[in-house]
């Protein structure tokens, strides 16, 4: 199976999983707002945003595990694969204990910290369950890393799809019975354990020599893992600050109702990035294998292929958001969220730039050349946080969105491309010309067609809007595939560097 076939198979499965997840989110968000009220839904989003920081105690080990497994697999070194998995499992089990302690400390004070009234019940228990889910889930993520290292995204995504379906079913059931955020926290905990356990069993099937035992914990592997993972951690913290701290800033300085409004726009932008990442995540084992072979020309080819696909996908999402965003939000969650359309329009620009650089991040991670890129992301994230803190008081949630947009766009359009081109010995002008210019020229007529269609017919209901978006996506991505990924494409561009 060649590169394009492997990428197509894995990215297709990843995309299906993400589509199911996005569909579930599209259904559950307005449903939970209706069942819980806007303020309580905002509280649930806030709990998830805060507890999500506990995941940083993995110190990037999960992602490093996938990278190292792919690397040693390419070298056919089963012993090192075993050492990597066992060592990572020990490290993340220790992290789980740390998260449990942090959860005990935070739970009683969460309501006081974010000015939650005493009339909202079970907040400490819900926070504890969410934190404990992170603690239990940390060591289980090692086995997902193993599956990713072996490029078994089919197993990963089948499990994820079943977990998503179960989450939707259980959520609807609990809401119908009249339960609140405590039930949501319990569902999250149960499914975290169930999904991780299934991936553990699948890992045994994929890597038959796997033997979980203390004797396989290796000190040299600890050094290798942390040498790789610490920069994954900085990346994860930076991304979290850039895209998820906004809810915490708004929750602290404003209200949970405004958290709910911002989260609707942020969720749409996040869905777009998830869709793009579905393609790119499967590239890291490929890049790691090329790194093991010391093949720089293939890394350049992989970068250009991934960037063009990511940028084309981002342009489609941006077109839909800018032309139809206000209508989509109104159809989706109803009245009371009008300001979310303004926030979405602002967040669309960092969504495009961030999506266009997703392949850069993945390739640098695969090559273990992401140290400097991590520092770039960290500087961007800190600037974003400072701007958001400055702008949240005078401009509210719009100011928070502007802080994200300004810093991310500057970093993704200028700083990151310069760095990756230097690492891969690729001319910056060649990079822009081969990765971005053909996509802009080829997709311009398609974008004009989608935007102009609103003057002919504007969808008024959820089902008609969904059909319109699906039809537009089919036409757009079908044309993009014919143009860029077939031998007879009209504007086929050479990958020669």
Region annotations inferred by a language model:
Residues 1-26, 79-87, 121-124, 151, ...:
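N-terminal membrane topogenesis motif
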Residues 3-71, 96-104, 133, 163-168, ...:
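Signature of the first transmembrane helix
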Residues 4-11, 135-160, 177-182, 203, ...:
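Membrane-interface junctions at transmembrane-helix termini in multi-pass inner-membrane proteins
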Residues 9-25, 184-199, 203, 219-289, ...:
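Transmembrane helical elements of multi-pass membrane transporters/channels
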Residues 124, 128, 158-206, 224, ...:
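Hydrophobic alpha-helical transmembrane segments
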Residues 421-431, 449-497:
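Membrane-proximal transmembrane or re-entrant/amphipathic helices at the cytosolic face
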């Amino acid at each position: 199976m060649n590169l394009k076939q492997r990428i197509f198979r894995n990215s297709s499965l990843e995309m299906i999983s993400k589509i199911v997840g996005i569909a579930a989110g599209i259904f559950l968000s307005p449903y939970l707002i209706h069942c819980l009220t806007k303020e309580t839904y905002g509280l649930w989003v806030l709990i998830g945003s805060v507890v999500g920081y506990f995941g940083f105690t993995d110190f990037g080990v999960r992602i490093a595990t996938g990278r190292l497994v792919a690397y040693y697999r390419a070298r056919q070194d089963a012993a090192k694969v075993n050492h990597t998995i066992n060592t990572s499992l020990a490290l993340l089990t220790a992290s789980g204990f740390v998260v449990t302690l942090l959860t005990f400390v935070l739970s009683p004070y969460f309501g006081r910290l974010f000015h939650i009234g005493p009339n909202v019940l079970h907040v400490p228990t819900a926070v504890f369950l969410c934190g404990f889910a992170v603690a239990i889930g940390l060591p289980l993520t090692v086995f997902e890393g193993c599956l990713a290292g072996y490029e078994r995204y089919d197993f990963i995504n089948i499990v994820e799809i079943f977990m998503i379906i179960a989450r939707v079913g259980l959520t609807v059931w609990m809401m119908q019975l009249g339960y609140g955020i405590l039930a949501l926290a319990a569902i999250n905990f149960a499914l975290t354990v169930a999904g991780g356990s299934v991936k553990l069993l699948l890992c045994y099937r994929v890597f038959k020599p796997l033997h979980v035992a203390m004797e396989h914990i290796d000190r040299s592997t600890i050094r290798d893992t942390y040498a790789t993972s610490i920069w994954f951690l900085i990346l994860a913290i930076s991304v979290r600050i850039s895209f998820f701290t906004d809810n915490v800033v708004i929750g602290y300085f404003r209200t949970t109702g405004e958290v709910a409004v911002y989260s609707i726009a942020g969720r749409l932008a996040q869905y777009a990035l998830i869709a793009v990442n579905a393609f790119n995540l499967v590239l890291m084992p490929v890049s790691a294998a090329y790194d093991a072979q010391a093949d720089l020309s293939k890394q350049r080819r992989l970068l250009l292929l991934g960037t063009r696909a990511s940028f084309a996908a981002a342009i489609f999402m941006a077109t839909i958001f800018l032309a139809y965003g206000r209508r989509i939000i109104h159809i989706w969650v109803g009245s009371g969220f009008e300001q979310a359309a303004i926030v979405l329009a602002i967040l669309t620009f960092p969504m495009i730039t961030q999506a266009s650089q997703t392949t850069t991040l993945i390739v640098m991670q695969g090559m273990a050349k992401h140290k400097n890129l991590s520092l770039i992301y960290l500087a961007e994230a800190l600037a974003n946080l400072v701007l958001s803190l400055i702008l949240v008081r005078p401009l509210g949630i719009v100011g928070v969105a502007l802080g994200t947009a300004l810093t991310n766009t500057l970093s993704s359009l200028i700083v990151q491309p310069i760095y990756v081109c230097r690492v891969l010995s690729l001319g910056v002008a060649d990079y822009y010309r081969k990765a971005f210019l053909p996509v802009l020229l080829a997709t311009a007529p398609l974008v004009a067609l989608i935007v102009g269609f609103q003057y002919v017919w504007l969808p008024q209901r959820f089902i008609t809007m969904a059909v319109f978006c699906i039809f537009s996506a089919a036409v757009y991505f079908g044309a993009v595939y014919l143009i860029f990924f077939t031998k007879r494409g009209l504007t086929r561009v050479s990958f020669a560097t």
